[in-house]
Curated annotation (Swiss-Prot):
Primarily expressed in the brain and epididymis. Not detected in the cochlea of Lp mice. One of its GO terms (cellular component) is apical plasma membrane. It comes from the Eukaryota. One of its GO terms (biological process) is hair follicle development. Residues 1-81 are annotated as: Disordered. Residues 57-67 have a biased composition (Basic and acidic residues). Pfam families: Strabismus. It comes from Mus musculus. This is Vang-like protein 2. Homodimer and heterodimer with Vangl1. Interacts through its C-terminal region with the N-terminal half of DVL1, DVL2 and DVL3. The PDZ domain of DVL1, DVL2 and DVL3 is required for the interaction. Also interacts with the PDZ domains of MAGI3, SCRIB/SCRB1 and FZD3. Interacts with PRICKLE3. The gene is Vangl2. Belongs to the Vang family. It is linked to Defects in Vangl2 are a cause of the loop-tail (Lp) mutant phenotype. Heterozygous Lp mice exhibit a characteristic looped tail, while homozygous embryos show a completely open neural tube in the hindbrain and spinal region, a condition similar to the severe craniorachischisis defect in humans. Homozygotes also have complex cardiovascular defects including double-outlet right ventricle, perimembranous ventricular defects, double-sided aortic arch and associated abnormalities in the aortic arch arteries.
Length: 521
């Protein structure tokens, strides 16, 4: 008996060690595959500014009521530390994405600010240096020269406001590569300012120019040149992209939701940022629970046949003929999975309509109760109930119907009890109708409508065969990937339309109506 107990304990330990070794080997193979796959893709990363690198979906520690959630994690007596394959995938992805903070965005902003400050102070320095260095030798500034001071002041003010409005805006995303057009404009401004400084140093500072009016006109010319550069920046950065040149088709890889957009001349990385802006308010929220087929269809097993020849060698031909007949009969059998799927979908739609009707009735009764209380308070004034207390008071009457409806439509992960209470409080505060309250739950809304912890991805990966700084071309396809799904973007150029004119003589539509005495009009 002791021997048996020792043997059973040893077998349990060895089995546990073997399972742990298999778990470590499987984890190592998964990490190596994920690294190899990440090396094989030609991808760059677009990250939202000022946000951590870890995805919101990696934090699943939200506390909920026991009756409010559908799933429960059970820890058995033999599993002290449990982890799923999805957790391993998420951890590996987060470890690969947790890189040091990229300072390229701050470096670009700092370089632009320094260049703008240099460009703004250069005309002022041109005007102040001659009076400070050789005031006695300067010729007096006349009326025309003094009028140029006003011109310089207002032009610099316009340039300052225009530069602030165009360049110093809060960035929407951290681009993986340099914005080529903006970099070219910065280089152009730098060369312009350096050229003016070289000319000013050689022809004015060294020669000690006595005509102060000429110095002022030189400063005015620099301000005019900077204004023209600013106008060029407006054309290249803002106006050039307004004319539609390409049609983009954006498809979500998991459920096939698609949208079409028209864009102008933009680089691939700027188009990617623009598509993400459109995605959050045009696409319905991504719900992975809606992608699964009914359990009855998935659990259906296709029956198969195995034919064995148990006779002698003489009966080989007979057994072969019988096996062929059996296999042919099995092939002719029709699979009824589509019928089961059809009836499952019909039953689901019936259940949704039933839950929806109960929810609508419950909400109508709750709002009717609120109106009745408001009328009674007007007749008999007493302690007034604030919207939060009113929402908590009527939520109990609709909570069960709401919970069943959200569970049936698989929207429960996107609507917590607190969010429903806040929305109900908002509707009561603004005297909204029951239909306005139910609008959020009866149909899937845009992604941005829901709480950020449910949908916002801090990091997207742009996968493209072309350099992301290149402009759009006909036939270009690129991907915007995140952990759960990806957006596939295909590009088509807007076709060229040729119109012809056909002139219609207005006289060709005229006719003469001759009336006779017998004609009745």
């Amino acid at each position: 008996m002791d021997t048996e107990s020792q043997y059973s304990g040893y077998s349990y330990k060895s089995g546990h060690s073997r399972s742990s070794r298999k778990h470590r080997d499987r984890r190592d193979r998964h990490r190596s595959k994920s690294r190899d796959g990440s090396r094989g893709d030609k991808s760059v990363t677009i990250q939202a500014p000022g946000e951590p690198l870890l995805d919101n979906e990696s934090t699943r520690g939200d506390e909920r009521d026991d009756n409010w959630g559908e799933t429960t994690t059970v820890v058995t007596g033999t599993s002290e530390h449990s982890i799923s394959h999805d957790d391993l995938t998420r951890i590996a992805k987060d470890m690969e994405d947790s890189v040091p903070l990229d300072c390229s965005r701050h470096l670009g902003v700092a370089a632009g600010a320094i260049l703008a400050l240099l460009s703004f102070l250069t005309p002022l320095a041109f005007l102040l240096l001659p009076p400070l260095l050789w005031r006695e030798e300067l010729e007096p500034c006349g009326t025309a020269c003094e009028g140029l001071f006003i011109s310089v002041a207002f032009k610099l003010l316009i340039l300052l406001l225009g530069s602030w409005a165009l360049f110093f805006r809060r960035p929407k995303a951290s681009l993986p590569r340099v914005f080529v057009l903006r970099a070219l404009l910065m280089v152009l401004v730098f060369l312009l300012v350096i050229s003016y400084w070289l000319f000013y140093g050689v022809r004015i500072l060294d020669a000690r120019e006595r005509s102060y009016q000429g110095v002022v006109q030189f400063a005015v010319s620099l301000v005019d040149a900077l204004l023209f550069v600013h106008y060029l920046a407006v054309v290249l950065l803002e106006l050039r992209q307004l004319q539609p040149q390409f049609t983009l088709k954006v498809v979500r890889s998991t459920d096939g939701a698609s949208r079409f957009y028209n864009v102008g001349h933009l680089s691939i990385q700027r188009v990617a940022v623009w598509i993400l802006e459109k995605y959050y308010h045009d696409f319905p929220v991504y719900n992975p629970a809606l992608l699964n087929l009914p359990k009855s269809v998935l659990a259906k097993k296709v029956s198969g046949f195995k034919v064995y020849s148990l006779g002698e060698e003489n009966s080989t031909n007979n057994s072969t003929g019988q096996s062929r007949a059996v296999i042919a009969a099995a092939a002719r059998r029709r699979d009824n999975s589509h019928n089961e799927y059809y009836y499952e979908e019909a039953e689901h739609e019936r259940r949704v309509r039933k839950r929806r009707a109960r929810l609508v009735v419950a909400v109508e009764e709750a709002f009717t109760h609120i109106k009745r209380l408001q009328e009674e308070e007007q007749k008999n004034p007493r302690e007034v109930m604030d919207p939060r207390e009113a929402a908590q008071a009527i939520f109990a009457s609709m909570a069960r119907a709401m919970q069943k409806y959200l569970r049936t439509t698989k929207q429960q992960p996107y609507h917590t009890m607190e969010s429903i209470l806040q929305h109900l409080e908002f509707c009561i505060t603004h005297d909204m109708t029951p239909k306005a309250f139910l609008e959020r739950y009866l149909a899937a809304g845009p992604t941005i409508q829901y709480h950020k912890e449910r949908w916002l991805a801090k990091q997207w990966t742009l996968v493209s065969e072309e350099p992301v700084t290149n402009g759009l071309k006909d036939g270009i396809v690129f991907l915007l990937k995140r952990q759960d799904f990806s957006l596939v973007v295909s590009t088509k150029k807007v076709p060229f339309f040729k119109l012809s004119e056909e002139f219609v003589d207005p006289k060709s539509h005229k006719f003469v109506m001759r009336l006779q005495s017998e004609t009745s009009v």
